[in-house]
Amino acid sequence: AVDIYLKKPEEERKPVMFVLDSLGMLSTEKEITDALNDKQVRDMTKSQLIKGAFRMLTLKLGQANIPMIVTNHTYDVIGSYVPTKEMGGGSGLKYAASTIIYLSKKKEKDGTAVVGNIIKAKTAKSRLSKENKDVEIRLFYDDRGLDRYYGLLELGEIGGLWKNVAGRYDL
């Protein structure tokens, strides 16, 4: 598909973006045949296939200037000094990606009713911005949607506009 896109003159190319949701849910042919034959073995070739596919994809998509967004699941790696999050599917995606953002959420409550989520985005890898920075966004379930003012108090405190004293903000 990318080769066909590249054959068109640049003026005729419409903007394109690839989205893969979710990398962890992809299956290999070996995995499918093992499931059909009722074998309960783990597919050890999946991460190699993913690594090879992303090696080719990043080259082709880079030539065509096509962005790609991939979602994937994470799991906690326990055993090191500090537990860390790791992506499933091997290391191929980690090396191919220019930006890796880990998303997590917690419930936003009004009394006992859950009215939305606080979504935390942490940059684990970035070629465009500082790594290991967090951003929190509030998302309401009702018509309000994303809260555009969430986090401005903390940002003003960091900028020196006011101080947080005993849970209150003083100018």
Predicted regions and their residues:
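Phosphate-binding/switch region of NTP-binding enzymes
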Residues: 43-159
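Terminal-proximal interaction/regulatory segments of ATP-powered molecular machines
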Residues: 164-171
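Conserved inter-motif catalytic segment of the P-loop NTP-binding fold
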Residues: 1-52
